[in-house]
Amino acid sequence: MQRNVRRRILSWLLLGSVLLGALTGCGAQAQSEVSSAAVLPEANSVANILERDGYLEGIWFPWLTHDDLGHGFTANETMVKYVGNAWSTVGIDKYGDQYLLEQIYNLKALGFNIMGYEGSIYAEGVIFDENGDVVGIKEDYLQNTRRFLDLCREAEMPVLWTVCCHSTSAVSYYNLEVWYRMTQMYAVKEVADHYVERFVKPLCAVLAEYPDVVVMCAATSEVENEMNDPDMGNFTEERETYGVPRESMLYFVNAVADALAQELPDVDRTLCGSTDNMTIYSETNLTYLGHQEYNADSRADDIANFRSPLPMLITEFGLGDGKYPSEEELVNAQLRFRDNFRAKDWSGWFMWCWSSHSSGSSYDLIAKNGGLTDFRKVAYALHDYIENYRAAYRGETIAVNTPTMFFNKGNGTVEWIKPTQSHTYRLERSVNGGAWTVLTTGGATVDAVGRKYTYQDTTLPAEGTVQYRVIVTAGDATASASSNRVNILQPAVNLVQNHGFENDLAGWTLFGNNGTYRVTNATAHTGAYSLELDYGSVEWQGVYQPSVQVKPNTTYTLTYYYKYAADATAKNAYCFIRGGNGTINVTDVIGQAYMNNGNTDGWEQETISFRTNSDAVCIDFRVVVGSHVYIDDVELCEMQ
């Protein structure tokens, strides 16, 4: 288990400036440079955050994943499984510590000062017997919980941890008999007691090891009927779900809340639930009453009229929630929503999902369980929202218009999200802590939306640590020189033979002969040649490189560039990383990417992070019907 992740990251976000560290994932260790104002105290709390920042701006980490690094998470592969890994092969061991660390720093760069994590929202880690009784907690769940919290400590990100489930949607993949069995803890007091003694308390013992990280825990106020069984109601007007009466559910929630108060007396407690249920839980052993607000644009008036004897916290905030409003409607909904809950002096909110129209503008599909999420689009909308919020409620007219920098996707690749206003800039570099020198004043490329800037530094030094920062120079009246920085380490040796295809197909092997699979000089990302894969009439043929030597049980990153040909009728190209003995083994895929974002105008970068299960891997590029794609600059390096 990787307990002590080495500090390689540079930064922390201060609410007046964005300071972000980043790295390629390959190479030597970077020096830490963390602001003392942001370092987590030995015993942290919500009160510390409120005193420092004045407000909680949180996000539920499991539902905000991205496709920008080529992971392509789906509903059953979201990071909610990162620790629990209850019924999915996707988890912390597959994607590695570095991926999570990158995610946390990216969220901090967007302005969030606390992160929610649903540690057992779907009963992850719970051991049931054949009758549905709770008999224990999984040891690997406890180990991965420590591993997760070690990384949160490394990134200095406080956490709200959900310690009990309120939904069993995963059992919708089973039959009703199994489904009912897994809900006994809500209905039977003896099973609820066993859940507290055999799961909650052992988990609390681990959470207690992180008083600087775990500042709040959450129980639940409802169980969702995600089976859509017409005979089962939701825990609202009829006061029952799964046939569980209000009294039984209240017993379960209070048992969990009481255990939290006993085992973690210095950690605040809240609920995650809906308005309909909150009044019946005001007697629970809580320090904050949590409120869940979906369709916030249409129900904003409801929360303004809500009353509670406890401090209020919006624990699940979903704006849009599957609807596709116009940008104007989205902005108006934001303002109305904030005006209402701020007027009642609520302590903060945790973003759950954010949906808007998918026309390719700066607002697009963002975070929701199910489907893919493009983190670049996430960055645009969240960045803009935070700008608007700070301008309206904090008067931070300087900080709001700074760029947001992100982890680079490859060696020497620097990326940032520009402010909403037009600007000119200069990109500066510092080597080994030396003087800042100008790299470019306009040489970065811009994506189709016009928000993400990318610059490729081709003059990396032979060794040492390299820092970058972007400074707004003109065109934005409220912006000043930013302190945004991104840190890049000297890369390790690329493990891919003939990675740029400059030596024909040396090191690569053809798989099938139906179609065109060759090296061509028709186009190239760098150099003179690239790999061309043109579908014929037989699917799943292509080119692979077998037996690439790696370390077992180690996280690696594969990066490459691709571009579709003008005559491609579909974007159906794939890259597979196969473990085992490093050969074509269809049952041993340990990493993959679906190349569906490419176009004919420029090259698209793809990155796959994966964890090895042996001492060799196979890199496999395939096409299916309609695909005609070019591949270049394939790079494999170890995340250290």
Region spans (language model):
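Active-site mouth of glycoside hydrolases
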Residues: 45-286
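Extra-cytoplasmic beta-strand recognition segments
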Residues: 150, 501, 531, 542-573, ...
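Substrate-binding cleft of secreted/luminal carbohydrate-active enzymes
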Residues: 313-394
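Pro/Thr/Ser/Gly-rich low-complexity, intrinsically disordered linker/stalk tracts
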Residues: 393-420, 479-490
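Extracellular carbohydrate-recognition regions
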Residues: 490-512, 640
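Extracellular glycan-recognition surfaces and repeat-rich motifs
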Residues: 502-534, 538
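Extracellular carbohydrate recognition
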Residues: 540, 602, 622-638
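Extracellular carbohydrate recognition and processing domains
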Residues: 584-616
